[in-house]
């Protein structure tokens, strides 16, 4: 379908991205409606998806999305946790409405619901996990584009993009390339220059790993206590520098060979002890008059 137009043809750099992310790796089972997308079967039972069929369906989906005038009429959904980040990034890049996480029943059919929506197009990450959304879309005639594996049910799916919709890198790569092609068809970005958004931003990240990286970055950015550095660049006092430190006053010392002069005779008896004893009012040597017996 896209072989006649060089801009829409599959390029080598896109094939390298597909192979590095594992987009071509299917499951061990194959549905009857997905047999045309399988290239071959490996010895371990995993089916290989034909990447040329994947690219043709991806370009068809991008043309369908670009044909809608209002980007807000496109709804992208992912109940699978690995696709929530990719869905949010796709919606941020293209202006679509994201539904990441659990789908509330009645979003497309119950008009009295607070989050009631009437999109013109629905894009799903996995039709098996997003079965409720696809069922409601069939009630109100909303066309559905879905990333499908070899064993995915294609009921209520109008445009199936065969790929590995279970891997983190595969889901992120598919949503990234789909967003890039939509922006190319809308004329927002040029095909001559590469898109400045990296595919890694569409990959799922564990919140615990993000918190650990933030803590490590905070510790690395904190400045350690620097040791004391003496300032040797200060000006020296010229008056002190010009002084002769050798001209010190001579202090005459004492004659240590002379006999020490005794000013007091410590062997003499001290005088006045009797006066001190008479000053005491009581006589401690006097026997007691009280008979305790």
From Swiss-Prot:
Which residues lie within the region annotated Disordered? Answer: 219-293
Q: Which GO terms describe its cellular component?
A: cytosolic small ribosomal subunit
Subcellular localization, as worded in the UniProt entry = Cytoplasm
Question: Cross-referenced PROSITE patterns, in alphabetical order?
Answer: RIBOSOMAL_S2_1, RIBOSOMAL_S2_2
Q: What GO MF terms are annotated? A: structural constituent of ribosome
Keywords in alphabetical order, please. Answer: Cytoplasm, Ribonucleoprotein, Ribosomal protein
Main subcellular location: cytoplasm
User: Which Pfam families does the UniProt entry name for this protein?
Assistant: 40S_SA_C (PF16122), Ribosomal_S2 (PF00318)
NCBIfam families reported in the protein's UniProt record: uS2_euk_arch
Among HAMAP family, the record links this protein to:
Ribosomal_S2_euk
In the record, the note on similarity to other proteins reads: Belongs to the universal ribosomal protein uS2 family.
Function noted in UniProt: Required for the assembly and/or stability of the 40S ribosomal subunit. Required for the processing of the 20S rRNA-precursor to mature 18S rRNA in a late step of the maturation of 40S ribosomal subunits.
What subunit structure does UniProt give?
A: Component of the small ribosomal subunit. Mature ribosomes consist of a small (40S) and a large (60S) subunit. The 40S subunit contains about 33 different proteins and 1 molecule of RNA (18S). The 60S subunit contains about 49 different proteins and 3 molecules of RNA (28S, 5.8S and 5S). Interacts with ribosomal protein S21.
Indicate what this protein is called per its UniProt record.
Small ribosomal subunit protein uS2
Give the lineage: Eukaryota, Metazoa, Cnidaria, Hydrozoa, Hydroidolina
């Amino acid at each position: 379908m896209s072989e006649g137009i060089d801009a829409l043809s599959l390029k080598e750099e896109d094939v390298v991205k597909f192979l590095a992310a594992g987009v071509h790796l299917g499951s061990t089972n194959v549905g009857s409606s997905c047999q045309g997308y399988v290239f071959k079967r490996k010895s371990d039972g995993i089916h290989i998806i034909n990447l040329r069929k994947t690219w043709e369906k991806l370009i068809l989906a991008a043309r369908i999305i670009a044909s809608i005038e209002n980007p807000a009429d496109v709804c992208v959904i992912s109940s699978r946790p690995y696709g929530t980040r990719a869905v949010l990034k796709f919606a941020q890049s293209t202006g679509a409405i994201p539904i990441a996480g659990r789908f509330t029943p009645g979003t497309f059919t119950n008009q009295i619901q607070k989050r009631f929506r009437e999109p013109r197009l629905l894009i799903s990450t996995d039709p098996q996990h997003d079965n409720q959304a696809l069922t409601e879309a069939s009630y109100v005639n909303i066309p559905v584009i879905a990333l499908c594996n070899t064993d995915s049910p294609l009921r209520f799916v109008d445009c199936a993009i065969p790929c590995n919709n279970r891997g983190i890198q595969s889901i992120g790569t598919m949503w990234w390339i789909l967003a890039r092609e939509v922006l190319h068809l809308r004329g927002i970005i040029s095909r001559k220059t590469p898109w400045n958004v990296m595919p890694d931003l569409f990959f799922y990240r564990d919140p615990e790993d993000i918190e650990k990286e933030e803590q490590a970055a905070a510790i690395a950015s904190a400045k350690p206590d620097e040791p004391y550095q003496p300032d040797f660049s200060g000006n020296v006092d010229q008056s002190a520098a010009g002084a002769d430190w050798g001209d010190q006053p001579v202090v005459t010392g004492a004659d240590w060979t002379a006999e020490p002069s005794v000013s007091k005779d410590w062997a003499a008896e001290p005088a006045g002890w009797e006066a001190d004893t008479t000053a005491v009012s009581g006589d401690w040597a006097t026997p007691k008059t009280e008979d305790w017996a």
